[in-house]
Amino acid sequence: MNILLIGYGAMNQKVARLAEDKGHEIVGVIDRTPKSSTPYSQYKHISECKEADVAIDFSNPELLFPLLEEQFNLPLVIATTGEKETLIQKLETLSQRTPVFFSANMSYGVHALTKILETAVPLLEDFDIELTEAHHNKKVDAPSGTLVKLYDVIKELRDNISPVYDRHEKTEKRTHDEIGIHAVRGGTIVGEHDILFAGTDETITISHRAQSKDIFANGAIGAAEKLIHKNPGFYTFNNL
């Protein structure tokens, strides 16, 4: 499988290493600032890389969004987070002519976490819910795309909920329709997500801990291996 990388930061450098270990080939890179140290051919547009079978994106909206406006039919695996509503809208339009896979978190374990959450929320309807995520000190967006995804799952299952991002100005007691959302940044934390269900005299916490960023790179490669055999459409872990 010939792979075009969109973005060449820490994550796509891991994708390159792991993909080559699996026998795939990196045939090009698109990055905001071309670098002489990049060991692959560098392009400005997706359509310029004729040899690619698929593109894997770990970048940001500033780089990705203009590329999505171009004319091409290359399958895309998208891991960019930020500006989610706009991103989904653009990807759904694009998916009418080419296969597109999107996940805010490329870990299959996080996908399993969402499935567990779909079962837990109805069972624990009287419990308050608080969401917490922790990442390294270089992550610029907060809350994480994964935490937003977890909140969206809860929103589909509980009526009239609202997110609360900061309680220091609140002077009234917590209501049941609030979902607390908390972000921690520090050190080299790869990624931690906790869902706290707090009831009367008992709590339940469901957690996911990423121990290496390799899980995200391998998840993207695995998605690409399947996506290149798919018809045009919008794919997630639920239907790939």
From Swiss-Prot:
InterPro entries linked: DapB_C, DapB_N, DapB_N_CS, DHDPR_bac, NAD(P)-bd_dom_sf
Top-level enzyme category: oxidoreductase
Primary residence: cytoplasm
Entry keyword Isomerase: no
Keyword check for Oxidoreductase: yes
Residues at which (S)-2,3,4,5-tetrahydrodipicolinate binds: H136, G145, T146
Reactions this protein catalyses: (S)-2,3,4,5-tetrahydrodipicolinate + NAD(+) + H2O = (2S,4S)-4-hydroxy-2,3,4,5-tetrahydrodipicolinate + NADH + H(+); (S)-2,3,4,5-tetrahydrodipicolinate + NADP(+) + H2O = (2S,4S)-4-hydroxy-2,3,4,5-tetrahydrodipicolinate + NADPH + H(+)
Enzyme Commission identifier(s): 1.17.1.8
Gene Ontology cellular component annotations, sorted alphabetically: cytosol
Single annotated GO MF: NADP binding
Residues at the active site: H135, K139
One BP annotation, GO: lysine biosynthetic process via diaminopimelate
Binding locations of NAD(+): A79, T80, T81, S103, A104, N105, M106
Localization per Swiss-Prot or TrEMBL: Cytoplasm
Transmembrane parts of this sequence: none
Keyword vocabulary terms for this entry: Amino-acid biosynthesis, Cytoplasm, Diaminopimelate biosynthesis, Lysine biosynthesis, NAD, NADP, Oxidoreductase
Recorded superkingdom: Bacteria
Record PROSITE patterns: DAPB
Pathway(s) this gene product operates in, as recorded in its UniProt entry: Amino-acid biosynthesis; L-lysine biosynthesis via DAP pathway; (S)-tetrahydrodipicolinate from L-aspartate: step 4/4
Function of the molecule: Catalyzes the conversion of 4-hydroxy-tetrahydrodipicolinate (HTPA) to tetrahydrodipicolinate.
NCBIfam families: dapB
Similarity comment text for this entry: Belongs to the DapB family.
Protein name, as recorded: 4-hydroxy-tetrahydrodipicolinate reductase
